[in-house]
A protein has these predicted regions:
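Alpha-helical elements of the RecA-like P-loop NTPase motor core of helicases
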Residues: 19, 98, 156
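TOPRIM fold recognition
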Residues: 86, 104-213
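Phosphate-handling DNA/RNA-contact segment within nucleic-acid enzymes
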Residues: 40-134
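TOPRIM metal-binding catalytic domain and adjacent DNA-binding surface shared by DnaG-type primases
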Residues: 1-47, 194-213
Length: 213
């Protein structure tokens, strides 16, 4: 696990980080609200990256060239203010979570209902047991994990532990590996039969509508 020194947490404003998020079709207003900008040193060199805080005070760390974490590693559990929510949506990583919020904002800009439910972000499928512990109090749980073996295993583990309350929503983007690919219009290799590479495109209104949930 990388060692980070001289950590400084700032508001997310660096042009390179915002450009990276824009290229992933992430709504920048949402990104600024949900993430921070981290400046740190590693092996004597200075770096900056997007930070996404977990429930134990650690961070998921991401920029165009690096994906890692600052310990302690844990899930992120986002609870809305006010009355307890009965529903919770589960995502594999921060980019999936940001993609979902961006899709909802695009489809329902005047009333996206982003605070109608709580959210759990695994930050790693190895954290699925921690997620299950956090999900016990919810009546309705929607899993929007990756369409790969690790994502399916994590979804199955949640379904096995929590039963009828769990809905696997990955079929809504079944031709895509994950929610960010869905947002960007990049189909998974299993569903693409053309030889030429597929370009990232801005999603159509119909694509966003599928995740009205």
């Amino acid at each position: 696990e990388p060692s980070f020194e001289r950590l400084e947490v700032r508001e997310l404003n660096h042009p390179a980080l915002l450009r990276y998020l824009s290229e992933r079709n992430i709504d920048l207003c949402i990104a600024r609200k949900e993430c921070v900008e981290l400046h740190f040193s590693h092996n004597g060199k200075n770096y900056f990256a997007i930070g996404f805080k977990n429930k134990s005070g650690g961070y998921e760390v991401r920029n165009r060239f690096f994906k890692g974490c600052m310990s302690p590693k844990d899930i992120t559990h986002i609870r809305q203010q006010g009355e307890p929510r009965y529903a919770c949506y589960v995502f594999e990583g921060m980019m999936d979570y940001l993609s979902f919020l961006s899709l909802r904002m695009e489809k329902f800009p005047s009333c996206p209902s982003l605070e109608a439910q709580d959210y759990v972000i695994l930050n790693s499928t190895s954290n699925v047991d921690k997620a299950i512990d956090a999900l016990h109090g919810y009546e309705r749980i929607s899993c929007l994990l990756d369409n790969d073996e690790a994502g399916r295993k994590a979804t199955l583990a949640i379904e096995t532990a929590l039963g009828y309350r769990v809905r696997d929503a990955s079929h809504l983007y079944s031709e895509y590996n994950d929610l960010n690919d869905y947002l960007c219009g990049v189909k998974s290799k299993q569903s693409v039969h053309q030889v030429q590479p597929v370009k990232r495109t801005v999603p159509s209104r119909k694509r966003g509508a599928a995740l009205g949930m």
